[in-house]
């Protein structure tokens, strides 16, 4: 399915760093919000006719209810780089990567044994982990490495903007097909190499919102974490892996422990560190522990019995109290990272 409609811009709702949100009225008088990327298009004005991609909304996919405006006029956004994003599509454009700026940095074989590396399967994991870390270690340097398992434009993430503006994240690197970080790298390994040059202490690899899931065993985009974890291990790194737990999730395949987490743990050939919070709900804890204990021969399970859970955040539309276990598990992951740093 690919559906384009003409419409008229009726109102500007938001002008953020790198994009514009407007209200568009279509030929059938439907009115919806649309996003205009200012990297690839001029700012649109009230009364202007625009071409809009409405495919995701028509399919009722998780795009936040937005349509996307296509470029409609001559436009040039100069870049010194030669590495293409959205390759071989009508919207391909170039970026300047760190590999182009300083190739010598990336020609050595890396060692990641001095870097704490977290691999997240969901974008909503990034915010609580970073908030907790910076709450108790404000001078820590955190780099968020954003890949292409979800949406691609980092500037669209409200969580990332909040983290950067409030200094809960120091640097943002986008890699693979993702773009609009503070820095651009080709892949996760080179992103980690570059993050070391920034004196990063904790590197958190995460997708943006909008990961793909099909309900099948391997049909989810975060399965790529298997390859990323194995590559990190190949170069001496040890990954901290925050397991996705939930007591509030209605979908059986994600209840208690998400099948995404379990599939990654089952098929990755490298060992990861899995912090487990000892939940007050002993029945829930026992069920989570029994499942994860099956992976003890391969992975390192760490009990975290005490955290400071006064940091309240939201995830995927559910408040802290509505999906408390999800956050407590992420806070426990951050608590484990703090303890690792204290031992160094």
Predicted regions and their residues:
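Generic preference for well-ordered secondary structure
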Residues: 31-34, 113, 143, 175, ...
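Extended, charged alpha/beta regions that create polyanion-binding interfaces
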Residues: 2-114, 128, 137-140
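Non-transmembrane, aqueous-exposed alpha-helical and coiled segments at domain scale
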Residues: 2-26, 136-139, 154, 158-206, ...
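Flexible, glycine-rich phosphate/dinucleotide-binding loops
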Residues: 59, 151, 248
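Phosphate-binding glycine-rich loops and their immediate beta-loop-alpha structural context
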Residues: 94-185
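Accessory terminal and edge-of-domain segments that mediate assembly/interaction
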Residues: 29, 40-48, 70-82, 116-119, ...
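Residue-level signal for short, function-critical loop segments
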Residues: 56, 148-149, 245
